[in-house]
């Protein structure tokens, strides 16, 4: 499996390799989307040199392009510019599509100020079903693995190639709970009313930021068997409580797989495709009006397969997130409590022994330990997240 982390990749490119059209997208049944951008130089990098530096962050969306999908049967579908709806350029062009004909080849034509670009016609590839999507933990000290098994392909004697996209949703909870706070107006401790209480739960979201691609070359029968898509450490907050994994599977051609593999080996990631020699990487897109080079590959899919899997926190061994260290104030005065409150600290414990000639002792915590919203969570529960009886 090809995995990695998203990092800024700076490459040195000759002038002939600059301002390249970058195409990300697939012709698909139902819905097709293309993300078009231009590679742009880092103006402040390598000053005084005749070569320019590029970064994955330095891309500019293609504006006012005309993007159409064509079939060799004469069919034609025009994509809309999503940026027109938002009022600013996005470089995203999309259109609704009928079910593709497996006997017809499809290609995309992109027209913009810099020229006309066309992809090679390809027949749509059928994606086999997902037989099982499951999680596995070898023992109580092991990470949690997300495993995939695909159904039988049309031709078990041929190697199958896939790409996967996934989305994650997970529940988080406060690492500390309190029912009290210090009221600055009355300069005393008070119990929280319901409207002041911190949320008991929150939900966070993520998706793959790396290219996930694989082949069945090392599997019998042209199908993936218990193929590891993801590895989650048992101390990761994602598996602290309830976790949901949504997977979209797409079968691709060998040529597209080789393109994805080249991206991986060059350190490319989604949203940025730059390398010292882009022209040496495989592509099925060319400029028909000039010798301008293109980065990207336009695949063609008859269908995609979706599956969902849950991880139940009670069925695995996991380590819950630890809160920050509490700050203890011995012989505390109300003015100290006011200062701590103004600094954003949260009152965790109040032990007032002054009536018995003992000091007031307070404990204070960091706000993110009490409020899941400060850890990037939403308090609006997604409809698909357990428990479902609420």
Positions of predicted regions on the chain:
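C-terminal motif of bacterial Sec signal peptides marking the signal peptidase cleavage site
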Residues: 2-4
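A sequence/structural signal for flexible, mid-protein segments enriched
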Residues: 6-390
């Amino acid at each position: 499996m090809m995995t990695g982390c998203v990092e800024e990749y700076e490459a040195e490119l000759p002038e002939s390799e600059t301002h390249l059209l970058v195409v990300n997208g697939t012709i698909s049944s139902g819905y097709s989307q293309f993300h078009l951008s231009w590679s742009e130089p880092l103006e402040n990098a390598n000053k005084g040199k005749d070569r320019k530096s590029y970064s994955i962050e330095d891309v500019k969306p293609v504006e006012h392009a005309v993007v159409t999908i064509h079939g060799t049967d004469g069919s034609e579908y025009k994509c809309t510019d999503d940026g027109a709806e938002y009022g600013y350029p996005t470089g995203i062009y999309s259109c609704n599509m009928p079910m593709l004909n497996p006997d017809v080849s499809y290609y995309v034509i992109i027209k913009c100020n810099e020229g006309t670009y066309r992809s090679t016609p390809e027949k749509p590839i059928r994606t086999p079903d997902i037989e099982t999507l499951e999680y596995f933990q070898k023992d109580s000290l092991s990470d949690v693995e997300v495993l995939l098994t695909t159904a039988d392909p049309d031709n078990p004697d041929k190697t199958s190639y896939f790409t996967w996209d996934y989305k994650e949703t997970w529940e988080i909870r406060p690492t500390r709970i309190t029912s009290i706070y210090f009221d600055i107006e009355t300069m005393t401790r008070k119990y929280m009313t319901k409207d002041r209480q911190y949320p008991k739960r929150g939900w966070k979201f993520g998706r793959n930021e790396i290219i996930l691609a694989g082949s069945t070359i090392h599997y019998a029968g042209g199908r993936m068997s218990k193929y590891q898509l993801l590895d989650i450490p048992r101390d990761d907050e994602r598996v602290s409580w309830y976790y949901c994994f949504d997977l979209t599977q797409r079968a691709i051609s060998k040529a597209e797989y080789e393109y994805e593999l080249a991206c991986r080996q060059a350190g490319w990631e989604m949203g940025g495709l730059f390398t010292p020699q882009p022209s040496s990487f495989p592509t099925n897109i060319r400029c028909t009006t000039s010798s301008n080079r293109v980065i990207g590959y336009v695949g063609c899919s008859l269908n995609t397969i979706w599956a969902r899997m849950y991880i139940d926190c009670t069925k695995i061994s996991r380590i819950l997130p630890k809160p920050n260290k509490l700050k203890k104030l011995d012989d505390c005065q109300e003015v100290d409590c006011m200062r701590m409150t103004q600094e954003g600290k949260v009152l965790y414990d109040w032990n007032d022994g002054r009536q018995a000639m003992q000091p007031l002792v307070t404990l204070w915590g960091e706000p993110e330990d009490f409020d899941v919203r400060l850890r990037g969570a939403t308090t609006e529960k997604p409809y698909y997240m357990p428990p479902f009886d609420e």
